[in-house]
Design a protein with these regions (language model features):
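N-proximal low-complexity "stem/linker" segments adjacent to membrane-targeting elements
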Residues: 1-31
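Structural signature of beta-strand start/N-cap positions in the alpha/beta core
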Residues: 10, 41, 67-69, 121
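Acidic helix N-cap motif at the loop->helix transition within catalytic regions
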Residues: 20-24, 51-60
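Active-site phosphate/pyrophosphate- and oxyanion-stabilizing loops and adjacent acidic/basic residues
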Residues: 27, 55-58, 84-85, 110
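Short helix-capping segments at alpha-helix termini
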Residues: 33-38, 61-67
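Short beta-strand/loop segment that forms part of the nucleotide-sugar
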Residues: 38-48, 69-73
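A conserved acidic beta->alpha catalytic loop
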Residues: 46-55, 102
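Acceptor/aglycone-binding surface of glycosyltransferases and processive sugar-polymer synthases
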Residues: 71-89, 94-97, 103-141
Length: 141
């Protein structure tokens, strides 16, 4: 854990039509955050989704009211707009974000957390080589 005092943590996901992945992604993020700090929140920015992403997120807010919330955009504002809303909504010391399509495991935040130290202000992670499942490769073409 960084420093001597636990930091607080915001995890957020911009999401657009991610009904197939967003529920499990949020639950995984909640589980991971709880192992790192008692002071955490998970936020999803629903960027005008036309599928049932919004309904799934509303149900998750009922199930996890203490640590989960959603920001709904009535119309799609694009990736940059969703990121801006996510950063605006985040209230904790540290902020972690990744996309709502579950391409990345929110559990990776634990590796970033380990890299923090009193003299480190910013940590960034990325995949050096991707190992996408077949459906991700097909969708990406």
């Amino acid at each position: 854990m960084p420093g001597t005092t636990p930091h607080s943590l915001s995890i957020f996901f911009p999401a657009y039509n991610d009904s197939g992945t967003i529920g499990s992604l949020v639950i995984r993020a909640l589980q991971v955050a709880e192992t790192l700090t008692p002071d955490y929140e998970v936020i999803v920015v629903n960027d005008g989704s036309r599928d049932n992403t919004g309904e799934i997120l509303d149900e998750l807010t009922r199930l996890y009211p203490e640590h989960f919330r959603v920001v709904h955009h009535v119309v799609n504002r694009g990736y940059g707009g969703a990121l801006r809303s996510g950063f605006d909504a985040a209230t904790k010391d540290l902020v972690f974000y990744t996309d709502g399509d579950a391409q990345y495991d929110p559990g990776e935040v634990t590796e970033l957390w380990k890299a923090l130290a009193d003299d480190v202000d910013w940590v960034n992670g990325w995949k050096i080589s991707r190992s996408d499942p077949l459906h991700r490769i097909v969708i990406g073409r």
